[in-house]
Curated annotation (Swiss-Prot):
GO terms for biological process: tryptophanyl-tRNA aminoacylation. It catalyses: tRNA(Trp) + L-tryptophan + ATP = L-tryptophyl-tRNA(Trp) + AMP + diphosphate + H(+). The gene is trpS. It comes from Salmonella typhimurium (strain LT2 / SGSC1412 / ATCC 700720). It is found in: Cytoplasm. This is Tryptophan--tRNA ligase.
Amino acid sequence: MTKPIVFSGAQPSGELTIGNYMGALRQWVNMQDDYHCIYCIVDQHAITVRQDAQQLRKATLDTLALYLACGIDPEKSTIFVQSHVPEHAQLGWALNCYTYFGELSRMTQFKDKSARYAENINAGLFDYPVLMAADILLYQTNLVPVGEDQKQHLELSRDIAQRFNGLYGDIFKVPEPFIPKSGARVMSLLEPTKKMSKSDDNRNNVIGLLEDPKSVVKKIKRAVTDSDEPPVVRYDVKEKAGVSNLLDILSAVTGQSIPELEKQFEGKMYGHLKGEVAEAVSGMLSELQERYHRFRNDEAFLQKVMKDGAEKASARAAETLKAVYEAIGFVAKP
């Protein structure tokens, strides 16, 4: 029986965080045995905001090494860089012609990013969801792991696929969202009602996977809790968002359940909780960073992973693009 195809990706434009790891990358790793996983470093999406060329190249290799350090295995999964497979951009252009201006105008992420990057509201930023649809549909993807911030984009991908299929027959699989049962939603350290984001301007809100352990300890000790007197370590996202976030992080790292942790910290101060979280996170990151540096220093291996991954991805992508071009009436290349 053929395994269902899973597609996901991350931009190389910012350092990945513990939120990316606990909420997504760890799930990607766990899916490798049961699914045919295709994981992409989406460098073409990254240039919708201005990038320094040298930094983008470095960040792409850094991200690849982090994928590997987190446990994504090139023997089990297809790992590649988006710009190495030209079919992404080719299908993206074709799908532009089956996507309505009004649909893109309603995308909340475009509104957010255009407010943030007001000096560079480019067509690529507006068109980003169509390239994302191409990324997904190119591989006849069955399942897409999505967070809250990408649900709207996946809905658009489904709409485009159904519209195209309605015109030309069953060219595309219509992808379904995959929402893992487990996976911590890690929030900002100082603003625990919003999700931790690698693009946050306030770096005290964020813990990067490559961050120095001393810096990690400092940030966690400064994390927002609350002013309850006496302090109560209790899981209550609405009333105690900061404490709940720290409990979520500790649970994700140690595997202990929230009720177990509540019992462990009964009658203790918030400082005790922060100390345990800091120790657990810095320990986890030390091990991950050791693996990261081993991969990052082996450039020949990284080049091989990229080359092999692009070849595997291209073979599958070419089949889909051929079917699309034939359906819309392009003359086949002699």
